[in-house]
Regions:
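Structural signature of outer-membrane beta-barrel domains
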Residues: 1, 18, 35-37, 63-67, ...
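Transmembrane beta-strands of outer-membrane beta-barrel proteins
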Residues: 26-30, 56-58, 112-114, 170-176, ...
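Short loop/turn motifs that connect adjacent beta-strands in outer-membrane beta-barrel proteins
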Residues: 4, 20-26, 53, 109, ...
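Flexible, solvent-exposed coil segments and beta strand-coil junctions
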Residues: 20-28, 74-84, 134-144, 154, ...
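Flexible loop and strand-edge segments within Gram-negative outer membrane beta-barrel domains
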Residues: 65, 90-96, 110-166, 178-210
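Signature of Gram-negative outer-membrane beta-barrel scaffolds
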Residues: 221-223, 227-249
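Transmembrane beta-barrel wall of Gram-negative outer-membrane proteins
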Residues: 38-64, 77-126, 155, 161, ...
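N-terminal periplasmic accessory domains that precede
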Residues: 8-32, 41-46
């Protein structure tokens, strides 16, 4: 925790930047993905280049999937038997869409990294195990890839930068970042309390959570000899969150 901050008291996974090619070059990669359990179709494309002091890499990935197939024709939810028409979990289709960009500048003793990424996911919930049981909502609608109520969607946006300067026996570095986590769950209004009124705004928004995180870390490392290394650092974090939805108490 002295080296990585208080959140590392239980351990840390140190994810290092991508390895920079030794020579100037342009490179790329493409991958396709398919799954039979839910008809997943997806792909990913990566492009990058090294030009003198600059190294840049970007990636875009997306996948779509349909309702999950299961080896059962019924499930029990709150003591009620719920049928699975066609042995499929209705409304469990979804999609994922991710994009990332990374660039690095390295000249002599100075190095700086900049990264931005956005991850989006939308998934349907099986209506037979969400909210008040209702067999009528389980009827096959003929479309295994549509997303209806109830569903969840999550978006995670992140900006980070790493700055570093080295002298003969001193290394000064800093990490600064911002994260935005936004999660929502939508479901037709339902309640176990007869006195709870229908919300005037977004009546079907069951849960919502928004988290803003600003973080910074500065570290000074002194290499006095081959046997000793001294480190001094400063770490700070600021968070702000908000919640909404009729299921939040």
């Amino acid at each position: 925790s002295l080296l990585y901050g208080s959140d590392a008291m239980g351990g840390v996974i140190d994810i290092t930047p991508a390895i920079v090619p030794l020579t100037n070059q342009f490179f790329g990669e493409a991958a396709l993905l398919g799954k039979s359990v839910n008809g997943t179709v997806g792909g990913s494309v990566m492009l990058g280049f090294r030009k003198n002091a600059w190294f840049t890499k970007m990636r875009y990935s997306e996948q779509h999937f349909g309702d999950y197939h299961v080896p059962a024709d019924t499930v029990i939810y709150l003591t009620q038997k719920m049928p699975l028409y066609g042995r499929k979990l209705k409304n469990t289709a979804g999609l994922e869409r991710n994009i990332s960009f990374f660039t690095q500048y390295h000249h002599k003793d100075y190095k700086s990294d900049y990264a931005i990424s956005n991850v989006f996911q939308k998934n349907g919930f099986f209506p037979g195990a969400h909210g008040i049981p209702d067999i009528s909502r389980l009827q096959d609608d003929g479309d295994s890839r549509n997303i209806e109520l109830p569903f969840s969607q999550v978006n995670h946006l992140k900006f980070t930068t790493h700055q570093q300067y080295a002298w003969e026996s001193i290394l000064l570095s800093g990490d600064f970042g911002y994260q935005n986590n936004h999660r929502e769950e939508w479901s037709a209004f339902h309640t176990h309390y007869g006195t709870q009124p229908l919300p005037e705004k977004d009546p079907d928004k069951e849960l919502a959570f928004m988290l803003h995180t600003f973080s910074s870390s500065v570290k000074l490392r002194l290499f006095g000899s081959s046997s000793w290394e001294h480190t001094a650092g400063w770490d700070s974090q600021y968070q702000q969150n908000s919640i909404s939805g009729y299921s939040f108490l």
